[in-house]
Amino acid sequence: SRSGLANPRQPASFLFLGLSGSGKTELAKKVAGFLFNDEDMMIRVDCSELSEKYAVSKLLGTTAGYVGYDEGGFLTNQLQYKPYSVLLFDEVEKAHPDVLTVMLQMLDDGRITSGQGKTIDCSNCIVIMTSNLGAEFINSQQGSKIQESTKNLVMGAVRQHFRPEFLNRISSIVIFNKLSRKAIH
């Protein structure tokens, strides 16, 4: 950004990695509560429901000539009414590659185009994606704090799953520690 080459329309984006129940989704809720004084200012997209090829039309809406054209998509409708929000893509590794292509457009340009051809601004969102990729490495290590070797194994699993251009658009990747007994109580 010091060089002046950063895209000011690019939304802040984070990939939270860790075990199930380690607080990834809860942190996203707290971010929405902190920034917007309302945890409901979060748009949650469950990517396990977006594993089919037609899932893009669920997010963006169908194109002209298809059933439901006038209804719009879930994501585009939500972003029209809540342009300032935390956008949570839960379990992003389960999304169809076409959905990831739409997300790539959002992370790159700060906008997406609905099925009706309307441009939706995403530049004021904070995009948070959660994933359990590499969880087996975190689970098998000793202690609750993530070790450097474990971090490398987790990042290797992430690099195998996602395309480099997708990972390069993410502002920060955060690996969550295992929950300790002290943290639970």
Language-model features, listed with the residues they occupy:
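AAA+ P-loop NTPase nucleotide-binding core of proteostasis motors
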Residues: S1-H185
